[in-house]
């Protein structure tokens, strides 16, 4: 929940900053002498400059054809997501300890928000970023790296072995393309204009229009995200559609399609790990339970679903599952990134 709140807050701040800066950028001009108007990346370069996602290299030049470093890309992701830069006294990587370096705070901020991971003690800030690293960092920055395992089977490229799930997600979100139908060239280094193209696509996805409606039944043609139907193993287990199901539904719906989420509050009684009873609740009943204060709260990051529960004297456990506004927004954001134009929520 905290992760989602930080991301949504950052995105709102980004919108305000960009809205205040676009007019000035247009007035001052953002043309670079080394980017021809007919170049395939001219639009991406221009808008990334106007949105303050990327700067030139000086002298009125963008640096067309130059490689993008990992540190520079981390900084652009901080700008894309609107993250407030952090500057801890000690760096998180052995090669990011100089607090005076221009990229120190960007690296630490990207690490704080999960775009960079601590799997290695090195972040290699001056290395040219590869295409697979760019896909991985972008998907993580957007907050959906958790789906990389699920998405791995969707990767259409035969030359990808290490980051299949991340590349599949970036491809599904329309952020990055292959060099051919079945080739991605994951180890190839990315140029500054290629990075600009990915950043602008991510920006456009994040700000795409998506309709949210609360309905009593799924509209015809809308793809419903499947909920868990078999309850077994440890409890509590959310009967809601997990993010994996929302991802699958959004992929089936396709660009411009719609997805339906089932979010009617559900009360379950379990004993010994077995569901012994269940019933749906009205919004009024849910509000009363949440206000009662005699139940413990829990949140499933995997399923993006909330619950409250209490233990009864007979050893059973009563659990009430529901979707909070933040839960719905997380799934809504995933659908937006995957090109869905409408989400219907059954409550």
Feature locations, PLM:
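Feature responds to low-complexity, polar/acidic, surface-exposed segments characteristic
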Residues: 2-11, 15-42, 55-104, 112-132, ...
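Alpha-helix C-terminal capping/helix-coil junction sites
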Residues: 49, 111-112, 171, 336
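Substrate-binding surface in catalytic domains of secreted glycosidases
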Residues: 213-289
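Short, acidic/polar
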Residues: 218-222, 323-336
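Glycan-binding loop/region signatures in secreted carbohydrate-active enzymes
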Residues: 256, 260-331
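Acidic/aromatic/glycine-rich contiguous surface patches that form carbohydrate-binding/processing clefts
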Residues: 331-347
